[in-house]
Amino acid sequence: RACSCSPVHPQQAFCNADVVIRAKAVSEKEVDSGNDIYGNPIKRIQYEIKQIKMFKGPDKDIEFIYTAPSSAVCGVSLDVGGKKEYLIAGKAEGDGKMHITLCDFIVPWDTLSTTQKKSLNHRYQMGCECKITRCPMIPCYISSPDECLWMDWVTEKSINGHQAKFFACIKRSDGSCAWYRGAAPPKQEFLDIEDP
């Protein structure tokens, strides 16, 4: 059996998560986390992490991240060794702990666009009352004014497209929501995207 998740825009990932941090994994080990309904032990991977910055979450730094032992059950594998930095969004478990799955937004920090990094500070939060609706194929429509249509899949066949990288869906004063372009990307990057 495989893990299946529906794709989300980074803003949705931010809004849905209890905890959003920038961190690196220092070590990993398999731990027991209680038993399942049949009495079999449940194994989880425990990553000890070094939190660099918290964008959303509890007052206490996150020290440990837990995940399922294999990707088939949505487990996430992080590089340990403390070199690679990640943006990690997931569920709080209290007392400096969080749980992550493959359906959560977990990406190497250096793959984020400047706009995405900046949006983590407040812009995504400003749009949490808006709804981002993914358009899997044309035509697609919004059903209420507080929705933004996420078109990356149709226009670029990628969920990591232009709107994911450079836009946030923000509520305007009249209550409607609209895509708002963040920090202008560097010219070269912009030109590359314009290429047919």
UniProtKB/Swiss-Prot annotation:
What Gene3D superfamilies does the database record attribute to this sequence?
Answer: 2.40.50.120, Tissue inhibitor of metalloproteinase-1. Chain B, domain 1 (3.90.370.10)
Q: Among the entry's GO cellular component annotations, what is one? A: extracellular space
The protein's location, in the record's own words, is: Secreted
Molecular function via GO: metal ion binding; metalloendopeptidase inhibitor activity; protease binding
Q: Which CDD domains match?
A: NTR_TIMP
Q: Which UniProt keywords apply?
A: Disulfide bond, Metal-binding, Metalloenzyme inhibitor, Metalloprotease inhibitor, Protease inhibitor, Secreted, Signal, Zinc
Protein residues bound to Zn(2+): C3
Any one of the GO BP annotations: response to hormone
Site note Involved in metalloproteinase-binding applies to: N16, I37, K43
Q: What does this protein do?
A: Complexes with metalloproteinases (such as collagenases) and irreversibly inactivates them by binding to their catalytic zinc cofactor.
* Binding partners and assembly: Interacts (via the C-terminal) with MMP2 (via the C-terminal PEX domain); the interaction inhibits the MMP2 activity.
Name listed for the protein in its UniProt record: Metalloproteinase inhibitor 2
Q: Which organism is it from?
A: Cricetulus longicaudatus
Q: Give the taxonomic lineage as stored in the record.
A: Eukaryota, Metazoa, Chordata, Craniata, Vertebrata
Q: What is the gene name?
A: TIMP2
